């Protein structure tokens, strides 16, 4: 009964529970496999993959903030060829029943399509998370990220959906005037779901050098500080679309995960909490039945349907 009440069914994903380590906070799984059995997880969102290898931004690339952190990693990854030849086969060999969500990044719709097509052929990749918080090299769009321009977002998502053999979930940036417009563009382009939110943009300064702490100047802010923002934006989007949402942004406890459900999420991504506590995900999973009992929640699916009805 405990297992059934935690199960989640989404396009392409039948999960034993809703807890998913967020992309960029869990590597390709090997880093955390020494701490616990990854089969405990609902799924894994692996690190972003681009067509070619990327070495990322210069250091320092990480800085602490009150109730969170800043990062400017720069999409460091070994590239599609290595991910297909080494990273995904390791996961399939060690965890053959664990569904993988592949995070895909790029700088043109052609690159998004190529990576989506290639990575979706891996048998353990059951869905793609499309990271559209990247600059675009095809258009002179004055420094806008792809996810800040609904028309660009539509083109990129459509290209990825047409190229992919698995459902595509689109990761939305909160750095927009109207996130609903971008969400609707993704839906119109054929997305099967959404993940949100990506990091906010912030910076810190070193009083001694009088310069930004991050070599890149700015970085993505994550952690508990962004949690209320994530809840608000998830609720805003959930009121306007029937696409399932994998909610993320500052989740560090079982209670926070259930709050995401109340906002309109259908599954939960856990990011920065993995850095402060490598057991964050299994801890949340273990506590779910107890906390659900405390608040009279019989199953996550019933809670999801209850929230969905209230949003209409």
Curated annotation (Swiss-Prot):
<feature type="binding site">
    <location>
        <position position="131"/>
    </location>
    <ligand>
        <name>substrate</name>
    </ligand>
</feature>
<dbReference type="InterPro" id="IPR001295">
    <property type="entry name" value="Dihydroorotate_DH_CS"/>
</dbReference>
<dbReference type="InterPro" id="IPR033888">
    <property type="entry name" value="DHOD_1B"/>
</dbReference>
<dbReference type="GO" id="GO:0005737">
    <property type="term" value="C:cytoplasm"/>
</dbReference>
<dbReference type="GO" id="GO:0004589">
    <property type="term" value="F:dihydroorotate dehydrogenase (NAD+) activity"/>
</dbReference>
<dbReference type="InterPro" id="IPR012135">
    <property type="entry name" value="Dihydroorotate_DH_1_2"/>
</dbReference>
<keyword id="KW-0520">NAD</keyword>
<keyword id="KW-0963">Cytoplasm</keyword>
<feature type="binding site">
    <location>
        <position position="171"/>
    </location>
    <ligand>
        <name>FMN</name>
    </ligand>
</feature>
<feature type="binding site">
    <location>
        <position position="197"/>
    </location>
    <ligand>
        <name>FMN</name>
    </ligand>
</feature>
<keyword id="KW-0288">FMN</keyword>
<feature type="binding site">
    <location>
        <begin position="198"/>
        <end position="199"/>
    </location>
    <ligand>
        <name>substrate</name>
    </ligand>
</feature>
<dbReference type="GO" id="GO:0004152">
    <property type="term" value="F:dihydroorotate dehydrogenase activity"/>
</dbReference>
<feature type="binding site">
    <location>
        <position position="23"/>
    </location>
    <ligand>
        <name>FMN</name>
    </ligand>
</feature>
<feature type="binding site">
    <location>
        <begin position="271"/>
        <end position="272"/>
    </location>
    <ligand>
        <name>FMN</name>
    </ligand>
</feature>
<feature type="binding site">
    <location>
        <position position="103"/>
    </location>
    <ligand>
        <name>FMN</name>
    </ligand>
</feature>
<feature type="binding site">
    <location>
        <begin position="71"/>
        <end position="75"/>
    </location>
    <ligand>
        <name>substrate</name>
    </ligand>
</feature>
<comment type="function">
    <text>Catalyzes the conversion of dihydroorotate to orotate with NAD(+) as electron acceptor.</text>
</comment>
<dbReference type="InterPro" id="IPR005720">
    <property type="entry name" value="Dihydroorotate_DH_cat"/>
</dbReference>
<comment type="subunit">
    <text>Heterotetramer of 2 PyrK and 2 PyrD type B subunits.</text>
</comment>
<dbReference type="GO" id="GO:0006207">
    <property type="term" value="P:'de novo' pyrimidine nucleobase biosynthetic process"/>
</dbReference>
<keyword id="KW-0285">Flavoprotein</keyword>
<feature type="binding site">
    <location>
        <position position="131"/>
    </location>
    <ligand>
        <name>FMN</name>
    </ligand>
</feature>
<comment type="similarity">
    <text>Belongs to the dihydroorotate dehydrogenase family. Type 1 subfamily.</text>
</comment>
<dbReference type="InterPro" id="IPR049622">
    <property type="entry name" value="Dihydroorotate_DH_I"/>
</dbReference>
<feature type="binding site">
    <location>
        <begin position="249"/>
        <end position="250"/>
    </location>
    <ligand>
        <name>FMN</name>
    </ligand>
</feature>
<comment type="pathway">
    <text>Pyrimidine metabolism; UMP biosynthesis via de novo pathway; orotate from (S)-dihydroorotate (NAD(+) route): step 1/1.</text>
</comment>
<protein>
    <recommendedName>
        <fullName>Dihydroorotate dehydrogenase B (NAD(+)), catalytic subunit</fullName>
        <ecNumber>1.3.1.14</ecNumber>
    </recommendedName>
</protein>
<feature type="binding site">
    <location>
        <position position="47"/>
    </location>
    <ligand>
        <name>substrate</name>
    </ligand>
</feature>
<dbReference type="InterPro" id="IPR050074">
    <property type="entry name" value="DHO_dehydrogenase"/>
</dbReference>
<feature type="binding site">
    <location>
        <position position="223"/>
    </location>
    <ligand>
        <name>FMN</name>
    </ligand>
</feature>
<dbReference type="GO" id="GO:0044205">
    <property type="term" value="P:'de novo' UMP biosynthetic process"/>
</dbReference>
<feature type="active site" description="Nucleophile">
    <location>
        <position position="134"/>
    </location>
</feature>
<keyword id="KW-0665">Pyrimidine biosynthesis</keyword>
<feature type="binding site">
    <location>
        <begin position="47"/>
        <end position="48"/>
    </location>
    <ligand>
        <name>FMN</name>
    </ligand>
</feature>
<keyword id="KW-0560">Oxidoreductase</keyword>
<dbReference type="Pfam" id="PF01180">
    <property type="entry name" value="DHO_dh"/>
</dbReference>
<dbReference type="InterPro" id="IPR024920">
    <property type="entry name" value="Dihydroorotate_DH_1"/>
</dbReference>
<dbReference type="InterPro" id="IPR013785">
    <property type="entry name" value="Aldolase_TIM"/>
</dbReference>
């Amino acid at each position: 009964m405990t297992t059934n009440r935690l199960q989640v069914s989404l396009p392409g994903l039948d999960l034993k529970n809703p807890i998913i380590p967020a992309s960029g906070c869990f590597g390709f799984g090997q880093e955390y496999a020494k701490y616990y059995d990854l089969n405990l997880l609902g799924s894994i969102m692996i690190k972003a993959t681009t067509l070619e290898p990327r070495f990322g931004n210069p250091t320092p690339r990480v800085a602490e903030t009150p109730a969170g952190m800043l990062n400017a990693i720069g999409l460091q990854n070994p590239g599609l060829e290595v991910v297909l030849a080494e990273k995904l086969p390791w996961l399939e060999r060690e965890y053959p029943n664990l569904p993988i969500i592949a995070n895909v990044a790029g700088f043109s719709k052609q690159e998004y399509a190529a990576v989506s097509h290639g990575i979706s052929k891996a048998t353990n990749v059951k869905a793609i998370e499309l990271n559209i918080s990247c600059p675009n090299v095809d258009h002179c769009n004055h420094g806008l990220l792809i996810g800040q321009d609904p028309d660009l977002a539509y083109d990129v998502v459509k290209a990825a959906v047409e190229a992919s053999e698995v459902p595509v979930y689109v990761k939305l940036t909160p750095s927009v005037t109207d996130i609903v417009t971008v969400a609707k563009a993704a839906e119109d382009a054929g997305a099967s779901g959404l993940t949100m939110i990506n990091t906010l943009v912030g910076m810190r300064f070193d009083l001694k050098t009088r310069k930004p702490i991050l070599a890149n100047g700015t970085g993505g802010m994550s952690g508990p500080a962004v949690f209320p923002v994530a809840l608000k934006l998830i609720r805003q989007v959930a009121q306007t679309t029937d696409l399932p949402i994998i909610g993320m942004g500052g989740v560090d406890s079982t209670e926070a995960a259930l709050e995401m459900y109340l906002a309109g999420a259908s599954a939960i991504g856990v990011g920065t909490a993995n850095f402060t506590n490598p057991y964050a995900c299994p801890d949340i999973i273990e506590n779910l039945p107890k906390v659900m009992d405390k608040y009279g929640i019989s199953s996550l699916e019933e809670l999801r349907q209850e929230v969905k009805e209230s949003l209409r």
